[in-house]
Amino acid sequence: LNNFKNKIAGYLFDKTDILGIVGRSKYQLPEIKGRALIKLDEVDIMQCYTPVEFENYTENIEALIKELNMANLGKKPDGIRVMPEIVTVDMVLSDRIDRPGIGLDTDEIEVQYLELCGNIHMVVGKEGTGKTNVLKLILEQLKEAEVYICDSVGSELGREYKDMAKFYFNNEVDSGAFYKLLEDEVSLRVSEYERVKNDKSLREFCMELTQVVIVIDDIERFINLCKDIRTDLEKLIPKLLDYGISIVEAVTPNELRGFDELTKKLKDVNSGVVLGIPDEQSFIRMPVIRNYKFVIGTGFVFKGGDIKKVKIPLI
């Protein structure tokens, strides 16, 4: 502004902004339409007038906009995206069952998704960072899928989603039945693909099937519940992933320290959601984010090396 000799300041909400434009003045700018301060050699007060009365100005502008819209049959450009103060569930819901929405990207204000066709997705964060909330958000978008749920000690998922699950368990006794159902599903997919493998790829075949997702709230507990079928699970997991069955697992940063094959397979992820302070976990490689302060309802969606900060709706 210092490059401009003559300056005019109309009404501004913050009076210090007026001072920054024209400098000190003996006049106080009143809340009168058209009243302004003008700086020539010194600061004076003036009244601005319009050349016409501008009757029905807003209505005429709206009519002109409508007329232009009707005349233009081309694709309308995207509007300027603005991050809402509160992100709600309906803002991130996906129209595809194989890619549930997680949150709004804080840079581009676009929905970020997880791709669910035969992958392991990790939701990692300390207690109280919103891991179960993310699982609930995903389950809200899987009501047309076949879902297997292994719940936490608190049974938070069971209270709302037990009835929609093909199989639900949170004890060691039911782990055998869980394995048998999964084994049957994989065997069915293998035999079905044998019939059509000359006509389509395995990926194309899996995309045509009902989406099957295993949702685990507390992966460490899941491993303990499945200790009697651990060896069988170690063999089954690679096969079920190959045939399009996905796993979504919640984990805290200090878990999965074992060296058994099942733990190794469940740690081998390249997609997921990081909650809390990114540096506090080592499962998903993240760039250093200095002075990051975690706020509930925020996180990072990670997909094959691409990381997006997102605002996540709370359920």
Feature annotation, model-predicted:
Residues 1-71, 169-170, 184, 237-243, ...:
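Conserved ATP-driven motor cores of ASCE-family P-loop NTPases powering translocation/secretion/packaging/pilus
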Residues 14, 34, 88, 92, ...:
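Helix N-terminus capping/helix-initiation residues
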Residues 24, 87-93, 111, 284-289:
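Short small/polar-residue motifs
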Residues 37, 72-87, 191-206:
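Short glycine-rich, low-complexity/disordered patches
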Residues 57-100, 107, 128-130, 313-315:
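C-terminal regions of RecA-like/P-loop NTPase motor modules
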